[in-house]
Design a protein with these regions (language model features):
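C-terminal non-catalytic regions of proteins with extracellular/luminal or membrane-system context
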Residues: 1-230
């Protein structure tokens, strides 16, 4: 191996070490001081609302005050917060999930039973967020109990289903289920909801390309679809 190849290999190994071993998610930053710039949370909330893309609305949005909401999907409780990659893989000071956001909204009521079921599942099946270039493309879904879904239908006006994806630098989207396409467990979740609910709001917690052909299958029960980004 000549000197140029040796130098190139050494440089590559060094870059990979710092990228993979010393990325934000792989280093221990618990002891570091995390600050919140005054006014920034309010600005980001406005930016998130203004940046949401409504793909479909069959008259269900905006939800009326007092609407009772059953929130489904692991990502509704363990959300994707970053854009992934050098500029997006951030060490956030705090995070607000979709479930937390609904509970913070005084106009809506989150179904506590469904929330409890998901919270308990997440405790027993904690999410592995991976590390640089090895983030999970999606969070595997919890199998839904048909009786729980039926009970939720009887107590709530609308079901909200959150579907999330992770893709970015060093972790490109793949043409496979659980990445570009819906995973089988996500299809099972939507099938269960479609059996009981007449209005389902779909929130897409994504930051890149995503197959949307599945909309045709559920068009009779989809009340709205929003891309809410990450």
């Amino acid at each position: 191996m000549n000197i140029k190849k040796k130098l190139s290999k050494a440089l590559t190994n060094t870059v990979q070490f710092f990228a993979n071993e010393l990325s934000q998610s792989a280093t221990d930053r618990d002891g570091e001081k995390k600050t919140v710039t005054p006014g920034m949370p309010e600005l980001l909330r406005r930016a998130a609302a203004d940046g949401a893309v409504m793909l479909e609305n069959n008259g269900i949005l905006p939800l009326e005050g007092g609407t009772r909401v059953a929130l489904f999907g692991i990502t509704g409780y363990e959300s994707h917060y970053v854009g992934y990659g050098s500029g997006g893989d951030v060490n956030r000071p705090y995070a607000v999930s979709f479930a937390d956001g609904i509970k913070n909204c005084d106009r809506l009521t989150l179904d506590p039973t469904i929330e409890s079921i998901y919270r308990e599942w997440n405790k027993k099946n904690p999410i592995n967020n991976g590390f640089w270039g090895h983030w999970p493309f999606y969070f595997p879904e919890m199998p839904l109990d048909n009786t729980a879904v039926e009970n939720a239908r009887n107590k709530n006006e609308v079901a909200v289903a959150v579907i999330g994806r992770a893709a970015g630098e060093s972790r490109d989207c793949k043409l496979q289920k659980g990445s570009y396409y819906l995973a089988d467990d996500e299809i099972a979740m939507l099938d269960a909801l479609a059996e009981e609910f007449d209005n389902i709001v779909i929130l897409l917690n994504i930051g890149g390309i995503f197959d949307m052909s599945w909309i045709e299958k559920y068009k009779k029960v989809i009340g709205a679809i929003l891309i809410v980004w990450q």
